[in-house]
From Swiss-Prot:
GO terms for biological process: organic phosphonate catabolic process. Mn(2+) 2 binds at D80, H81, D164, H222. InterPro entries: Metallo-B-lactamas, PhnP_MBL, Phosphonate_metab_PhnP, RibonucZ/Hydroxyglut_hydro. It comes from Escherichia coli (strain K12). Homodimer. Zn(2+) binds at C21, C23, C26, H225. Its cofactor is Mn(2+); Zn(2+). The keyword Hydrolase applies. It catalyses: alpha-D-ribose 1,2-cyclic phosphate 5-phosphate + H2O = alpha-D-ribose 1,5-bisphosphate + H(+). The sequence shown is that of strains K12 and B. It comes from the Bacteria. GO terms for molecular function: manganese ion binding; phosphoribosyl 1,2-cyclic phosphate phosphodiesterase activity; protein homodimerization activity. This is Phosphoribosyl 1,2-cyclic phosphate phosphodiesterase. Mn(2+) 1 binds at H76, H78, H143, D164.
Length: 252
């Protein structure tokens, strides 16, 4: 069975359009909703199971009815990646497994008052675990809070989800070089910069990383309005694409 990944959000905490900004990218997004960007998140479908990657969307309860998905897979506990959990936890129904890094603090009072969310499913770096037949490997990332990317594998597919990060730790880079993903969804918040940014990648960083990893298809996510404005005037190299909210990626 094929693996399907849908990008439900491709922006950062600021979103696109950014409040009060009149740059070309923000003006375009106000005119045309297809250019809007919500918090970085995704949906993985495999073996009739649905996994939600991160929970930054405000309308999760409207998008998903009880029992319509199996679990959350969190990259980290910054607010723009978990804010949708706060109202959802007070719902009625069966417990919902939440897989994620062993962050002792979490976010605000989520751990103290989890409601129907089951946060006991902490994962460890490079230790493979199974989600309804999907093999998942947590990959340490470079961010201001404990953050994991994930390599998602089936018998025929290999997809990497790498957000939020500034570059990659050496062990993660080596692992991806030796386990080349067919598709790599990669944090790229910034246009090319002379200096390497903190917490998120710029385009120069992503290009350099893929010279090592050599994924044939790189899809950029966590896009800022500044990068969108740059993209309106510049083209990406072959093999690189800009993700958009609602983008569906099938990997046979």
């Amino acid at each position: 069975m094929s693996l399907t990944l849908t990008l439900t959000g491709t922006g950062g905490a600021q979103g696109v359009p950014a409040w009060g900004c009149e740059c070309a990218a923000c003006a375009r997004a106000r005119r045309s909703p297809q250019y809007r960007r919500q918090p970085c998140s995704g949906v993985v479908k495999f073996n009739d199971a649905i996994t939600l990657i991160d929970a930054g969307l405000h309308d999760l309860a409207d998008r998903w009815s009880p029992g319509s998905f199996q679990q959350f897979l969190l990259t980290h506990y910054h607010m723009d990646h978990v804010q949708g959990l706060f109202p959802l936890r007070w719902g009625v129904g069966d417990p919902i497994p939440v897989y994620g890094p062993p962050d002792e603090q979490g976010c605000d009072d989520l751990f103290k008052h989890p409601g129907l969310l089951d946060f006991s499913h902490t994962v460890e770096p490079f230790v493979v675990f199974d989600l309804q037949g999907l093999q998942v490997t947590p990959l340490p990332l470079n961010h201001s809070k404990l953050t994991f990317g994930y390599l998602l594998e089936t018998a025929h597919s290999r997809v990497a989800w790498l957000s939020d990060t500034a570059g990659l730790p050496e062990k993660t880079l080596k692992f991806l070089r030796n386990n080349q993903p067919q598709v790599m969804v990669m944090d790229c918040s910034h246009p090319p910069r002379a200096d390497a940014p903190r917490n998120h990648c710029d385009l120069n960083t992503v290009l350099a990383l893929n010279q090592v990893i050599r994924s044939p298809r790189v899809i950029l996510t966590h896009i800022s309005h500044q990068f969108d404005a740059w993209l309106m005037e510049n083209a990406l190299p072959s093999g690189f694409e800009v993700g958009f909210d609602g983008m569906e990626i099938g990997v046979a």
